[in-house]
Regions:
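Gly/Thr-rich phosphate-binding loop signature of adenosyl cofactor/nucleotide-binding cores
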Residues: 1-85
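Charged, amphipathic alpha-helical linker segments immediately N-terminal to NTP-binding catalytic cores
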Residues: 88-127
Length: 127
């Protein structure tokens, strides 16, 4: 028999003491169905084959530096952000106190995807 995993995002935010960067988005009914998380480096580069979109997505220092470079090409950036957020991901967590960009806020709110933050390092948060 398959184990079923389900937790409300609201509970995860509380338990992990996450900062909600998108308070306009209602997190009370968003469910997390996977215990595993995903670092979306390949997706942010535009490769979406075998994307684990049902997992919590975490952006650390490496992804953040790449996103800063990506935002120099507005057309490519918007295309990647549209694909990423339109895939129905449950949320994105930024580690190390990293702040999402204005462009990411806009697209995340468009697709109702919460952006969250933690002061913890990526590996520490993932453990």
């Amino acid at each position: 028999m398959e184990n079923v995993y389900e937790v409300k995002l609201e509970k995860l935010i509380e338990k992990m003491e996450l900062v909600n960067y998108t308070p306009k988005i209602d997190v009370s009914e968003i469910l997390i169905h996977q215990a595993e998380i995903n670092r979306p480096a390949l997706q942010l580069a535009g490769f979406f084959d075998h994307f684990a979109e049902n997992r919590v997505q975490i952006i650390g220092r490496v992804e953040h530096v790449y996103l800063q470079q990506l935002e120099q090409d507005k057309i490519q950036m918007l295309d990647v952000y549209e694909q990423f957020f339109n895939s129905k991901i449950p949320c994105v967590v930024f580690s190390r106190g990293i702040q999402p960009s204005e462009a990411m806020f806009y697209i995340a709110e468009k697709y109702n995807v919460p952006l969250l933050g933690t002061p913890l390092g990526t590996s520490e948060f993932m453990a």
